[in-house]
Regions:
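Gly/Pro-enriched, hydrophobic low-complexity segments
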Residues: 11-109, 299-301, 308-309, 314, ...
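Zn-dependent metallo-beta-lactamase
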Residues: 86-175, 273
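Active-site metal-binding loops of divalent metal-dependent hydrolases
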Residues: 183-185, 214, 230, 237-238, ...
Length: 364
């Protein structure tokens, strides 16, 4: 379906536009009134951090090529914020391509998935390509051809590592509630984590969601926990950011309904924050590091298990011969906090013994 005779505003300018629906997605195409060329293609989308957003491809600098015109400037914007700026510097029209190189093997054709329908996470796929990590899956949490599902992996009694996807979390069972470290990717993944944890430990609420840092891939599922009434625990200087995130309209969220998060309790950690039920103790520790401002690492005292994201991915690769700045930050944070971890679980990777890393730092 296509509609015309519309006007849409972008950047303070009103453009004549048409809308058309294809594959369950509505596209809004805005045109320059003088040249008649498209200047902006928009979808009304949902971003896991910023909620309801305009996702725009901005086209400019149209140049003639082989009887047509090509926009050599192609910029992607999210609510006016540039997320990718592409410039075409060399274009070959109708190049000769070896047909054999374009032939799909019969074995692959036989197992190929049918075209996706419904809520297709195309924005997530496109934006991952911008950073060079393409995930060929309709599920933004994990490649369904590489792994069957998210799963809980027990690290110690009452401590579960949520693995099986591209990004992990950690669940800690307390007497009458749960603590979760990190809310990666989406509310769909967080809802899975909540259901799995409650199936294991009973219908306990998540009282604390501890976010190691504000990056979308490790914090994009925070709304599911906020909807449970959880307290949000974040690093120094991050409260204002999360207030803006939680105030953003989220009516297009495919994984849950819209909520009023204006009264969410946020605890900002400048040094250490302890969560206890009188017997078990979980804690979050501010960590100076080169990756991001406001980083936290988590710790479960009785199990002597830490949780770390991005500055170390335990078990993902062998330790280097010499300590790196991010790895040194983990050791410095543990020493400063006065904690004695035996192992660390990661927001990426798996788990690893801490002693070899501490030894590497001490050997420098």
């Amino acid at each position: 379906m296509c509609s015309s005779d519309l006007d849409y505003a972008a950047g303070g300018v009103s453009y004549p536009a048409v809308t058309y629906d294809a594959g369950g997605v509505r596209y809004i195409v805005m045109f320059d009134a003088q040249s008649g060329l498209p200047v902006r293609i928009r979808t009304l989308d949902f971003d896991n951090m910023w909620g309801d957003v305009n996702y725009d491809l901005v086209l400019a600098e149209w140049q003639p090529l082989a009887g047509t015109r090509v926009a050599v400037s192609q910029r992607y914007e999210l609510n006016g914020r540039v997320v990718a700026d592409i410039r075409l510097t060399q274009i070959t029209p109708n190049p000769q391509v070896n047909p054999a190189g374009m032939t799909v093997p019969d074995a692959l054709r036989a197992t190929a998935a049918r075209p996706a329908t419904g809520n297709v996470p195309y924005q997530w796929v496109i934006r991952r390509q911008f950073i060079g990590t393409y995930l060929d899956s309709e599920n933004p949490s994990f490649d369904t051809l590489a792994t069957q599902s998210l799963r809980l992996q027990e690290l110690a009694p009452g401590v579960q590592h949520v693995v099986g996807g591209s990004h992990n979390a950690m669940v800690v069972d307390m007497q009458d509630h749960l603590i979760v470290f990190d809310a990666p990717v989406s509310d769909a993944q967080s809802n899975w984590t909540i259901r799995a944890a409650q199936a294991r430990y009973g219908a306990k609420p998540v009282r604390y969601i501890v976010l190691t840092h504000h990056h979308m891939d490790h914090a994009g599922g925070l709304r599911a926990y906020m909807a449970q009434g959880a307290t949000l625990v974040v690093g120094r200087g991050a409260t204002a950011h999360y207030r803006r995130v939680l105030a953003a309209p989220a009516t297009r969220n495919p994984d849950m309904g819209a909520y009023d998060f204006s009264k969410v309790n946020i605890i900002e950690v400048s040094d250490r924050y302890t969560m206890t039920d009188g017997s078990r103790q979980g804690s979050a520790h501010f960590t100076e590091n080169p990756h991001v401002d406001g980083m936290l690492i988590g710790y479960v005292a009785d199990a002597r298990i830490g949780f770390v994201t991005d500055i170390w991915s335990p078990g993902a690769a062998p330790l280097p011969k010499e300590i790196s700045t991010p790895l040194a930050a983990v050791v410095t944070a543990a020493r400063r906090a006065g904690i004695s971890p035996l192992r660390f679980a990661g927001g990426h990777g798996g788990t690893a013994e801490y002693a070899p890393l501490a030894g590497l730092a001490g050997a420098k």
